[in-house]
């Protein structure tokens, strides 16, 4: 079994007002910096890039950053909301490998509110290029499209491991009440992979 040596954590989208508001940027918000620190202290090189204009995301701009980082069979991918959708589009269209893919509150934009950003076809062949796909979602998530995205992902990737919560909303700091996300860390380092 190969050990994870690298991780890429991708934040989700936000509204323009939130982007320009004082406070941490998207890549330094919610549980992302905490998870990055936890992985780094375990010897896993971890990147949390600031994706351009998350309030009006353009796939080609986000892809450029992902291409610079690269991925392989030892790379762990974690995406929150539309960040997970972007990671999935990237590894699908580029036919890339990864060790495990963790999609937290996965959002594939089923109603196309973000234009062509996540306009791609899911491909079951992705399963053959990754060790595991994990879907983490909460029954009380109020973001439109998450439930539909989870259903679509579960249909295309029937072997994906689903981790359903009841009270985590969209997994933001306001939903979790903390910057920590120990359940995700345990899945990554603990073994349910």
Q: Which residues does each PLM region occupy?
A:
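Short, surface-exposed "cap/lid" segments of acyl-processing enzymes
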Residues: 2-42, 50
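Active-site nucleophile loop of the alpha/beta-hydrolase fold
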Residues: 12-13, 51-54, 102-111, 138-139
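Short glycine-rich catalytic loops that host catalytic nucleophiles or stabilize transition states
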Residues: 49-51, 163-170
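Gly/Ala-rich beta-loop-alpha elbow adjacent to hydrolase catalytic centers
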Residues: 77-88
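Flexible "cap/lid" loop of the alpha/beta hydrolase fold
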Residues: 106-129
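Short beta-strand/loop motif that positions the catalytic acidic residue
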Residues: 129-130, 134-141
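Conserved alpha/beta-hydrolase "acid-adjacent" motif
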Residues: 142-148
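Catalytic histidine-centered segment of alpha/beta-hydrolase-like enzymes
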Residues: 168-179
